[in-house]
Regions:
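Glycine/threonine-rich beta-strand-loop-alpha-helix active-site module
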Residues: 126-230
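Short glycine/serine/threonine-rich phosphate/pyrophosphate-binding segments
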Residues: 71-74, 95-99, 125-128, 150-155, ...
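C-terminal catalytic subdomain
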Residues: 310-374, 380
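Hydrophobic alpha-helical topogenic segments used for membrane insertion/localization
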Residues: 3-26
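Carboxylate- and glycine-rich phosphate/diphosphate-binding segment that chelates Mg2+/Mn2+
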Residues: 201-310
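ATP/NTP phosphate-donor binding region
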Residues: 32-142
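C-terminal charged capping/lid subdomain of soluble metabolic enzymes
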Residues: 32-43, 47, 353, 363-437
Length: 437
């Protein structure tokens, strides 16, 4: 009995001590939680980093067919992949303009096809299920995704659903949740920015939950990417701008990650950043500039290679959360969020951003901090010259908790971010996004 009484006293004393400590510092538990989060995130990054060489060897990037009129080679690409009837996945505009001559070329080469041309921006779970149903009803054996990131992501997700008929989209969200071979995918980008033609990612919106699912699995990497600049000349200026900044975000976020970088990913990111700084404004001002259009396609591809290896960061995590709630165009969200997050990262990313400032010619002298800040300022200037906003005034305070929850779950749970955020820091960034509108 005495031992029990003594134990109770000790327990009470311990509780009291914790209470006193908490009273002395109300952030006691928050600090402990933050430290645990940092440890878990960094440990997970290091574990994943060890598996990357094996993943790279098992799942090489897509083969590339590039240059003006390269889309004419799609039939021979499909024949090489033994695709006899292909599911063409696209959106309404591209379906009316770019797809018909490609479909006619397939007919001439004896390749059957069926077309789903209702993919929306931020493709939904409902759209993915419709594509899957049409694919199965028509006995298809491959996917041909033509358009921006939305058709490519929808095709990837549909391929995953065909391969795993009993697993809903939500259960495949996260890293390596598909883990099974899917039907061959050929990606034909008509925008220059998403990088989906080379990556293992697909982002799908659940409108009922107002949430975006990021599915990342190496089995979803397309077998071929067809980079034909002639297919991008009809892009409106706004789409040129936002998809171009999307590609820049991929390259920059890849470059500043805490882990996973290697010489190849860094080289791809650097090449992408330089090409974008040299060619995005040209493509924006003259959509028929084929040289600039092709350079932007290559930049998007290179950026995709980079972040397919390293992942991205909080810019994308916040953009995905906002897209789920407000249906914000992904590239536009990245354009607004990127400079704010890069500034918030502070000294953790100054060396990398300083080097990007040097190779782009933005600033070649001064301290790392000065060069990094000049690089961020150059991004803001580029946005301004293309008519993109500096912030968003439509974000409501009542949605902050949900955005914070989703962004932290994605950022801390998936990406090797250079700085690990807690709720307070994420809220600070969201406030800046609103205040700078």
């Amino acid at each position: 009995m005495k031992k029990t009484y003594k134990a109770l006293l000790c327990g009470a004393a311990a509780v009291a001590a914790v209470g006193i400590a908490y009273a002395m510092d109300e952030r006691f538990f928050e600090k402990a939680k933050d430290k645990l989060t940092v440890f878990k995130c960094r440990a997970n990054s290091k574990i994943m980093e060890q598996a990357l060489p094996l993943t790279d060897a098992m799942f090489p990037g897509p083969k590339v067919v590039s240059g003006a009129d390269s889309a004419k080679k799609i039939p021979e690409v499909l024949k090489e992949l033994n695709v006899n009837k292909v599911m063409i996945v696209t959106g309404p505009t591209v379906g009316r303009t770019i797809v018909p001559p490609i479909a006619e070329n397939l007919e001439r080469h004896g390749i059957g096809y069926t077309i789903y041309d209702q993919v929306e921006a931020n493709p939904s779970v409902k759209t993915v299920e419709a594509i899957r149903a049409q694919y199965l009803e028509n006995g298809c054996d491959g996917f041909l995704a033509i358009g921006g990131g939305s058709p490519m992501d929808a095709a990837k997700a549909a391929a995953a659903r065909v391969a795993k008929p009993n697993t809903p989209i939500g259960k495949m969200a996260g890293l390596k949740k598909v883990m099974i071979k899917v039907a061959p995918i050929v990606a034909v980008p008509t925008t220059s920015g998403t990088g989906s033609e080379v990556t293992m990612g697909a982002v799908i919106s659940d409108h009922d939950e107002r949430h975006k699912y990021a599915i990342m699995d190496p089995n979803l990497v397309p077998k071929y990417a067809v980079l034909d600049p002639k297919l991008t000349v009809s892009m409106p200026k706004f789409v040129t701008a936002t998809t171009g900044i999307d590609a820049l975000t991929h390259a920059v976020e890849s470059y500043v990650t805490w882990a996973y970088n290697n010489n190849a990913s860094n080289r791809n990111a650097e090449e992408a950043v330089v090409k974008i700084f040299r060619n995005l404004k040209r493509a924006y001002e003259d959509g028929n500039d084929l040289e600039a259009r092709e350079a932007m396609l290559i930049a998007s591809y290179k950026a995709g290679l980079a972040f397919n290896h390293t992942g991205v960061g909080y810019v994308h995590a916040i953009a995905h959360a906002m897209g789920g709630i407000y249906n914000t165009a992904h590239g536009l969200a990245n354009a607004v969020i990127m400079p704010i997050v890069l500034e918030d990262y502070g000294t953790a990313v100054h060396p990398q951003l300083a080097h990007l400032a040097e190779i782009t010619g933005v600033k070649t002298t001064g301290s790392d901090a000065e060069k990094a800040n000049a690089f961020i300022a150059a991004i803001r200037q580029m946005n301004r010259e293309m008519g993109l906003p500096t912030g968003f005034d439509f974000i409501e305070q009542k949605d902050f908790p949900q955005i914070i929850k989703w962004a932290l779950a994605e950022g801390n749970g998936t990406y090797p971010v250079p700085v690990i955020y807690n709720e307070a820091r994420m809220r600070h960034v969201l406030n800046r996004i609103v205040l700078e509108a």
